Amino acid sequence: MQFSFVSLLAALGFFATVRGDLHQLIVGTFGTESLYTLEFDDAALTLDLIGNSTASAASSWIALSHDKKNLYGTSYSTAPAFVSYTLGNATDILYNSTLDIGGNCSSAKAIFVTAATEPPYAVYGTLFGGTSAGCGSVYSVDENGALSELIQNYTYKSTSGVHGVALDSTNSFIYSADDSANTLWTHKVDNTTGELTLVGSVSGPVTGADPRHLTVHPEGQYLYVVLEGANELAQYSIDQSTGIPYFENVTYPLIPSNATSADYWSDEVALSFSNNYIWATSRARSTNNTGYISAFSVASNGKIVSQLFLEPTTSSGGAANASVFRSVAPSEFSDKYVALTDSATGFVEIWSLASNGSAASVVAHVDIDDGGCCANAVVRFDSTPLYLFYESTG
């Protein structure tokens, strides 16, 4: 989920001109067959709902193709499958296809999808829940980027439930966060077919750590993992010869030190536009508590330098059930903005990083209380700059 920030202030006598851009986000849902389009104005700091497109299925996670011309989603409310759409303008979302996952995991739900940024632009999906979620799938795409064929169905282990995956910047390796089996998996990517070969796996740092989501620094030396059960962000180093991550006992809290860990479950992690910061979130299991959002400074090689802050969010982020989710994603052209989605009450917020990085605060908010929103969001469109005029005294 990403935003750009470009602003220009010019004195024109008693008036000033602000040059801002409009950015459109697409937001998925858990329980309604809709894809919402939002528009963020980075000058006026407003966030508006501008489109509601009928979807073929609710999508708990959506991802863009490398060129942003296609959207891929989980088919969350049906038998495990993945869907694809062609994207036109900001609100023109055209359904293409639905492909089942195959294998022996029919009782689970499709939970996560991501797309390669290098040829052959394969799409990867994983499952969660049910009695058998230890399957993953690889899909080819056609010349237009739509899902074409299931080309590989692979397995983790019988107790697995992989809630998130991440490709490295060269698309050489894909890492899987196995929440149910407390394991991190490493697969090698075939750069001709996109198919995967298992390289190895490592257990979570402690029993009940439960890795949920993860991301890889572009330099390829470090992997960042949200530990849902431990409510921590863990930094892993990556073996440069094998690609396998190894834990060096570096973790940071995603809840306050006086909080009861059992009352929370941590969720999301993402790098900022410049890769100088990491954003991460936690959720409360009760609406009586808030969740938290945190940011970290990062060295040029990817090593975490320090935790900058831990701020309470405006809601719990969700109660303890499978249909609750919180997503955080950074902007594409600035470290300043991050989008936070919330399904506990159904909203999307834009948070702004303080100029010195010491805090963050909400600058825009939109409610979408449809009983299923909001899952994650992606940024598809950047429009022509918008010029706003306001009275100036200096």
Show where each model-derived region lies:
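Fungal secretory targeting signals
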Residues: 1-22
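An edge-strand/N-cap motif at the start of beta-rich repeat modules
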Residues: 20-47
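Short loop/turn segments immediately following the C-termini of beta-strands
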Residues: 30, 75-78, 126-131, 141, ...
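Short loop/turn segments immediately following beta-strands, especially the blade-tip
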Residues: 37-45, 84-93, 138-147, 187-195, ...
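Blade-edge beta-strand/turn elements of extracellular beta-propeller
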Residues: 45-50, 92-100, 146-155, 191-206, ...
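Beta-rich, blade/repeat-based domains predominating
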Residues: 55-67, 102-121, 155-171, 204-222, ...
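Loop-centered beta-sheet repeat module
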Residues: 173-234
